Amino acid sequence: MRKIIHVDCDCFYAAIEMRDDPRLAGRPMAVGGSAERRGVIATCNYEARAYGVRSAMSSRHALKLCPDLLIVKPRFEAYREASREIHSIFREYTDLIEPLSLDEAYLDVSDSQWYAGSATRIAEDIRRRVARTLHITVSAGVAPNKFLAKIASDWRKPNGLFVITPGEVEAFVAALPVARLHGVGKVTAEKLTRLGIETCLQLRDWSRLALVREFGSFGERLWGLARGIDERVVHNDSRRQSVSVENTYDTDLPDLASCLARLPELLESLNTRIERMDASYRPDKPFVKVKFHDFTQTTLEQAGAGRDLDSYRQLLGQAFARGGKPVRLLGVGVRLRDLRGAHEQMELFPPQ
């Protein structure tokens, strides 16, 4: 049985700012862009969350909810340095570390010899050491797989630890709302609700075949998650999955024509980034991201499509049609194929 830990720093950017400037502690504060430049909240402390302020919210709206909110500019180098220190602590317990962002990661400690192999005690020690060394708090979840470990880390936030043992998996998952399942977004959650499925126990009543008919290949995944099954391994290689560029506009783009007019400059920036990548990557599926004025958003990609302007125009037209509202942010990108992995696989069978 695997032993997976998911570690998630509590309001990481805000925590670093409060650590470095104690005057910020105890008052509602956030890290993000200015309201005057249509900035967005990257994260906020728990005092701000009490007013309803949330990540990805416009700074202007956040200030309406909390007029006393102090918004500070992000200092990414400080966050990266803190992240490096945290990961150096992780590496003392295992080499199997999968970073998800600067402030969270999966650890596979199945073969760790620390604390006689107790994942719970390892997680406790990591939390203590991060608090002592960096003076910030982290939450952790321990479970037999990644899906449950991530849910567990959120169960007792902030500054908490939650453990789901193998014997507790079935009952824990049965009561879990389907909206908490990995990969279930707003649209899928709404469809499940229309089908009368709100908990994993109800989801278990559906056969694998019936779920595949309703949700395509994702139905197979739903069938497994409803039973607490997640075979994904912890990858300790943080290779890039995509490259993209996006822009938030000072004034909403009112219609599709306005959005299409912005495509050439976005593609120029994207192609510049692609040219800087090393030869172990190959651009694959193109995608577009559209965030509407009400902060709803959609991402659309297409296998087999080209990376020319016409291909992105078609994708943008389809994505815009999903909302049909003024647009505040446009993004374009491309999924990446890792040629290094393909090369290594080929080398398993050298020429005779």
List the predicted regions and their residue ranges:
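Gly/Gly-Pro- and Ser/Thr-rich, intrinsically disordered tail segments characteristic of DNA damage-repair
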Residues: 1-214, 220, 338-340, 345-352
